[in-house]
Amino acid sequence: MALEQAGTLTADSFRRGVFIGTGIGGIATLEEQILIRHEKGSRRVSPFMVPMMMPNAAPAAVSMRHGFQGPAENTCTACAAGTHALANAARLIAHGRCDVVLAGGSEAPFVETAIAGFTNMTAFSSVGISRPFDAERDGFVMGEGAGIMLLEEWDMAVERGATILAEILGGASTADAHHITAPSPGRSEEHTSELQSHHNLVCRRLLEKKK
């Protein structure tokens, strides 16, 4: 759908990239093949198991299907993977490596082992409602799906008459070196300031460019 909406691309195939994030990767394939090995023996495990379960299989498959011969990369950073992929894709364009990048995230974690793991860590909402920004939030609801955007260098998009839906001004990420899932108490302001500093820098550069 992203390619269809974008229309005819003019960028060289070597300057077209793919950046797709996933939190887990091919966990369904892994569980399936573990059961096969347990029930039927090691020789029945699929030779395609490894390439099917690798997190970077998604961008690789997309690049092969559409002939994108630039970077085909993956971020595997849990729930932030798709957003990180968008930020990294935007950097590929901002730094002059790519003119076009398909970017986003994909996840399909509906297997018994994943469900059991999230259940036992009490990560699921007890009321069955996912509301991450609500003060009364109590967990998430597992789902599967994908979201992909086509990012393009601004001048190239304007020149070919593309319908521009949004502009990414910048992005930043930090680690609070505290806990694998829980945020560090009292440090959110410092981490937010990193993004704000980057955003201000990008805005200044845009204003200078327009003068």
Language-model segments: residues:
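Conserved active-site "lid/cap" helical segment
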Residues: M1-R16, S193, S197
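A short acidic, glycine/proline-enriched capping/turn motif at secondary-structure boundaries
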Residues: A2, V18, G23-I27
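Conserved catalytic cysteine-centered active-site region
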Residues: R15, G25-N88, R97, G117-M142, ...
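Short glycine-aspartate micro-motif
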Residues: R15-F19, D99-A103, L165
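Acidic, glycine-rich active-site loops and adjacent beta-strand->loop/helix elements
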Residues: T22-G25, T77-A81, G105-F110, G170-A175
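Short acidic, glycine/serine/threonine-rich loops at helix termini
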Residues: T29-E32, V111-G117, H178-T181
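Condensing-enzyme catalytic core mediating Claisen C-C bond formation in acyl metabolism
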Residues: G128-E189, S193
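Positively charged, low-complexity/disordered segments
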Residues: E194-K211
